[in-house]
């Protein structure tokens, strides 16, 4: 079984990847998207999104990292894909699933689901630009406002020469509403294709992962939000281990406050610690109290002191 850590814009950056891969057994991480418009991006853009390039495209604990590109113009997707692998990325991924209004308004992400030909052209251009021994993956949803084009979308990915396909089991319009998850549809796509299909959506624990794999027939899953709810989720999903005890979660947060974000203006940890605690509150009652304590703090040093002051031995 493979477990991949999903790309989550504004959430799963290099520091969080470092922390989560240290306490997990992820097979692969995908970066936050690199927005490609009409130019070959400077090298520094790739290094900013993925400092792991300085470590052979691996996190400090050794987990491989693949870059995700977001755009709609095949030529520029291809040129930036070529640059990415020249810099050392282990393959590239094409974002065809982001539901953000901002992203969709500029023609990227899930907007491509409306026209599978665009997905085909983009993925094909990337495949031709990247050496054959390196993977080119694509992440999609079941469609824009319905699943009517799901097979056309999947066929476009395979015919373009992609190595594997990640399918989020909802349409763009369904967003992240739990009641709409359709693992069966992912399974129908898997049966149709000859390339590996990775299931994504509503995987929160061992039981949901087993159910997803049973229904879809997939032997690989990608997890996103759940990885923040339960920091050791890949081990829960892979080995049926118990969730990380709260004292260990606090220790992880304490380490987080000690990590430095390149280019930080002093507000990084203010937003990110509060954000992570909002996810943790879904699984840990203790996180609610801590969140209430830090939510009124508005600078990184105060946040760090509040987290560091917790005596783990007394928890």
Curated annotation (Swiss-Prot):
EC numbers for this chain: 1.3.1.-
Listed Gene3D superfamilies: Aldolase class I (3.20.20.70), Dihydrouridine synthase, C-terminal recognition domain (1.20.225.30)
Enzyme class: oxidoreductase
Names of the cofactor(s): FMN
Superkingdom of origin organism: Bacteria
UniProt-listed SUPFAM superfamilies: FMN-linked oxidoreductases
Keywords: Flavoprotein, FMN, NADP, Oxidoreductase, RNA-binding, tRNA processing, tRNA-binding
Gene Ontology MF terms: flavin adenine dinucleotide binding; FMN binding; tRNA binding; tRNA-dihydrouridine16 synthase activity
Reaction(s) catalysed (UniProt annotation): 5,6-dihydrouridine(16) in tRNA + NADP(+) = uridine(16) in tRNA + NADPH + H(+); 5,6-dihydrouridine(16) in tRNA + NAD(+) = uridine(16) in tRNA + NADH + H(+)
PROSITE patterns referenced in this protein's UniProt entry, alphabetically: UPF0034
Active site per the UniProt annotation: 98 (proton donor)
Function summary: Catalyzes the synthesis of 5,6-dihydrouridine (D), a modified base found in the D-loop of most tRNAs, via the reduction of the C5-C6 double bond in target uridines. Specifically modifies U16 in tRNAs.
Record-stated family: Belongs to the Dus family. DusC subfamily.
Alphabetized PANTHER family for the sequence: TRNA-DIHYDROURIDINE SYNTHASE, TRNA-DIHYDROURIDINE(16) SYNTHASE
Protein name per its UniProtKB record: tRNA-dihydrouridine(16) synthase
Protein encoded by which gene: dusC
